[in-house]
């Protein structure tokens, strides 16, 4: 562990090491990918081949996740954790070390954790309640067997409770139940008898690989979890295999697992009362306040058990073997902040395509809306920031579009969204291992994106990978510098949401926390950034020199309590102590009104009322009021903009006035930003920074260009000149001292007249399947699907557009080649020299250095998507869906062929211009 955490500390010092330059690139800064091992049917030669292809393209890490296999290939499958499988893991680790790729692995196959070693005793568990109404005053005999037949062999009787509502009696009859029958001389009156059986969900591992099939484990049971990891201990020890760099856990998709054998004992110890004495209220369909409070206590207990018995134990186990953990907490029935914070690398997930209305970005009807907006993505990064974790990772581009239709240009906006949300260690979802000899399209995972050498976008993916690497090299440097902490009102959610087991999945968050989501976007639109904080982290936060310092060592200017109804007394009391110690506390819409939960309610309410009396008296939250509170200040009001302004925190004008999105981090000499224009308009103006600066550097992560920015002082604040087209991004680094001997940033001024290159083009194909031979005089730069060749509408290809042009004698500092609408990425050569790769809007490259007087040969190698080819294969009935279990589905998870797909435009698809520019 010392080696890994030493590197973590180096990240924080990175800014002083690499001032004015691009940071040195480490493997963690490069993009990584989930590496699907289909059937674990891998061999040494093809593992080496795949890894070398990944490294050559620019990947820095793989995460092995074994899944279901390929039809007719069972003889080559390697059972998970078998000696043969471990031998291939050893080979992978050795090859990864040789070529500079970090090797992670899933702590299981498919998802969730489980498999053949999970006994029925250790399998995921559920509560089964049954009710019987009886009249007392006589001997009662009841058959208590479980009604659900499949539960009878496995369910165990935990409690038999009797309740008399008239005299409020509660009797524990468990000891009177023998052999599935209750014999009881019932006192007079009407009795409600409730039995609790501990049953099983019978859920099995989804998409399991050979050797990984079996029941999902009970994540809430400490012993079951420990026994699960013991199988890994045994396999690694017996096969003398090194443990991987990181162990991974996918999103929590354990369904219906709402109990564990010792739950009632754990509940009583943690909540201070016996849940079995309140079964009628707990299972009631009508949700009164008592039921809501008891259910809230149940949900908090589930959260505690999941964090302590699963994620914390898993992380401690990994640390014991010199590894770290990476976890997706979303989907779990636990406080997401505390769950994410209990592991080493919190990981968020994108699911679908975001719509930013970026100018010129290709549109595709076969997409689904991204369910992970900024508010969802920030759960993982918030936990990382407040807990002092250096990395936030992401499962990236899951179901961005249908298979075979995802372009690099569509990836960039959602990648930028993740960056501004705090991600700095991305993983593609994903890359299937595919043998070199496999027939195209090779081995595929059922869900997109397919970032692999068998996908045509791999041709120009290295340019995209380099973009990610440059961005992450900065985003891993220094420390987070968000403005506010925002209290996560989890007790309001636990109290208000229907049902009992409450899962915080990506797709349900709009229902789980609509008010909180609105708050997050409001704060962001006011020009600020924030991290969420849980009750546990509030209680460990200190005030140092007027700043809030979290347990992880990250500082914030104030904390926002957003319209919270329920709050534990310890949390409110600590907030008041922070205010007394010079902190700024902002309450919006109302003060907390009550304590959560049911146990010792009246006593806790009395203590809470005493704390409420210490809050400043406020006539109405309609008016924003800042009240001094000993050394600190308490701000109240309904209007976020007004309340946040009174905190004295300076908003970012680039967000409020110009609509840009950004994230800011700090380093020893200042700050650095990642900025993206995720909107229809661009920016070309002086922008006021929220932080002071004596000098500013700009870094273009698309090209590697860098230079000292133009700055000026306006009313004591630093302004920097910024130019961004719609969809573009830039890294901005500030310094507390004046930079000297640094090249200036080149600001572009387009001249009013451009050179149209709309005629004289020829087209041939560097590679194409099915093959297209010869050269075509197409004249205008148009989609090759329109040329007179039977294979043109169906080929997967790299087409080369060639033209000979004469550059006019126009005084210019440089020339920009504007490729217009490119389908989908283009490598440009001018006079035989590589002039760069255009893979995202606005598809422009600076090319002046390669132009010469007289004739100039321009070659544009455009690579399309594989959609046209795969659709043709489906129309011809060619079998390529050769996978077990789920066998490549569409966005709606239906096995629909692509026979109806119309040809997608391919190649250059519009005007090409050469624009003379002046640098200012």
Predicted regions span which residues?
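Bacterial Sec-dependent N-terminal signal peptides
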Residues: 1-21
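Mature N-terminal segment immediately following signal peptide/propeptide cleavage
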Residues: 20-61
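Carbohydrate-binding surfaces of carbohydrate-active enzymes
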Residues: 32, 43, 47-48, 61, ...
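Acidic/aromatic-lined carbohydrate-recognition and catalytic surfaces
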Residues: 67-175, 184, 193-197, 204-206, ...
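An acidic-aromatic loop/edge-strand motif
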Residues: 111-121, 126-142, 146-159, 163-166, ...
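Extended acidic/polar, glycine-enriched regions
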Residues: 150-155, 159-237, 713-753, 853-855
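C-terminal structured "cap/appendage" subdomains that terminate the fold
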Residues: 546-547, 562, 570-573, 603-613, ...
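Aromatic-lined ligand-binding clefts that engage carbohydrates, nucleic acids, or primary amines
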Residues: 688, 805-831, 838, 858-862
